[in-house]
């Protein structure tokens, strides 16, 4: 059977692409290598309330807790408090990620998409240099699926892009190694997602505490791979928990480990092929969060697919509309935040403490790069030289 689009991966990016494409009349198939959508969970489970604007989730069962905002703790304990609308795409809800993924996939199927579980994509089908479908193994059966467009939504370890000639290799400098417990029997402020910074806490990254209830929270860590060594993330996470008065009595009910891309977005379009979500590196380089950009990018990809199907044109030039649109929608933010990441990596804990001191009492009317720079330099003029690259970005 031939499809307009075969989507490899049933995460938020893949299922959103399928949902919106099917809604516009495209014949769509999702391939999921695992036996269950949304499992295992590999996420801190925070997402901004802007997710509601995309209408991909019904009901509220996927919500574990509502957040009022975020608190950022400098190495010396200085705290910056931000309201949810100012705190970025990872603050608003803490979710049950397995239910979150299932709900988006269910919505895609309701709109007409098909879904195959236990189906591992093993390569691309080509006629000459033209991609015409996907090779896969469904349970123990080798199959070929014909499609005009293949969408790589296969996550941080994406192979689809490489098969099409896109360099998706991540350098250690652009990869976070992560570990997370879901702890119970703890004390936590249910209203806030907490982030802890410091070279001794999480080199090149941060520790997060995302409450899922009054005595349950996801407590995790991301460490930049170029600054890490085997077992470091887990060792530092255990140390943090053992020294935190509200967490040290906690007991784990779930553990997960993985990797998160924190580099710049990659090339996302070839003839007959698109990349979305983590496979496209649509992840905030500072926070490592990517749920909003995955859903948003999936919607833009779907609209491009629908247009291509209508025109019956699937070449790179036609599909490049997708890349142009995501760059305009959130690409500039990702590029800016990559520069911010590089600046933060160069800073000593002393400088991070100065940053927090500058911002702790600042009343943000808007959370813009320029407003942050003004607040920082206004209280600590010596920071100006360190922030010059950021100031240049803010004024261009």
Where on the chain are the PLM-derived regions?
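Extreme N-terminal starter segment of soluble prokaryotic enzymes
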Residues: 1-5
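Glycine-rich FAD pyrophosphate-binding loop
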Residues: 6, 10, 20-42
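N-terminal Rossmann-fold NAD(P) dinucleotide-binding loop
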Residues: 14-15
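N-terminal FAD cofactor-binding segment of flavoenzymes
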Residues: 34-75
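Dinucleotide-binding Rossmann-like beta1-alpha1 core, especially the glycine-rich loop
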Residues: 78-100
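Predominantly flavin-linked oxidoreductase catalytic cores and closely associated redox partners
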Residues: 107-248
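FAD/FMN-dependent oxidoreductases across multiple families
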Residues: 123, 227-305
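C-terminal helical "tail/cap" subdomain of flavin- and related membrane-associated enzymes
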Residues: 306-396
């Amino acid at each position: 059977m031939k499809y307009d689009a075969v989507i490899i991966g049933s995460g938020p990016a893949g299922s959103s692409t399928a949902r919106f494409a099917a809604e516009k009349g495209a014949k769509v198939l999702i391939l999921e290598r695992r036996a269950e959508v949304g499992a295992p969970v590999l996420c801190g489970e925070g997402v901004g309330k802007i997710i509601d604007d995309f209408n991909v989730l019904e009901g509220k069962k996927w919500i574990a807790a509502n957040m009022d905002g975020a608190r950022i703790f400098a190495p010396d304990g200085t705290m910056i408090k931000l309201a949810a609308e100012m705190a970025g795409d990872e603050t608003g809800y803490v979710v049950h990620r397995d239910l979150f993924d299932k709900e988006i996939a269910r919505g895609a199927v309701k709109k007409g998409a098909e879904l195959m579980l236990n189906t591992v994509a093993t390569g691309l089908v080509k006629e000459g240099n033209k991609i015409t479908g996907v090779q896969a193994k469904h349970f123990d059966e080798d199959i070929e699926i014909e499609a005009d467009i293949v969408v790589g939504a296969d996550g941080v370890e994406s192979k689809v892009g490489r098969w099409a000639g896109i360099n998706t290799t991540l350098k250690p400098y652009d990869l976070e190694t992560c570990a997370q417990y879901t702890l119970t029997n703890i004390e936590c402020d249910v209203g806030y997602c907490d982030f802890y910074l410091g070279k001794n806490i999480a080199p090149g990254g941060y520790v997060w505490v995302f409450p899922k209830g009054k005595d349950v929270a996801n407590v995790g860590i991301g460490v930049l791979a170029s600054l890490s060594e085997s077992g470091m993330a887990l060792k530092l996470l255990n140390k943090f928990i053992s020294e935190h008065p509200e967490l040290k009595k906690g007991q784990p009910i779930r553990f997960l480990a993985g990797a998160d891309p924190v580099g710049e977005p990659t090339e996302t379009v070839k003839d007959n092929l698109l990349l979305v979500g983590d496979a496209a590196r649509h992840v905030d380089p500072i926070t490592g969060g990517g749920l909003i950009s995955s859903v948003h990018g999936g919607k833009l990809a779907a609209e491009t697919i629908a247009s291509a199907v209508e025109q019956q044109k699937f070449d790179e030039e036609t599909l490049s509309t997708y890349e142009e649109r995501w760059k305009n929608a959130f690409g500039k933010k990702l590029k800016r935040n990559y520069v911010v990441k590089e600046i933060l990596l160069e800073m000593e804990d002393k400088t991070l403490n100065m940053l927090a001191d500058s911002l702790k009492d600042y009343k943000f009317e808007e959370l813009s790069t320029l407003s942050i720079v003004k607040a920082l330099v206004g209280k600590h003029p010596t920071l100006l030289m360190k922030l010059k690259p950021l100031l240049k970005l803010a004024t261009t």
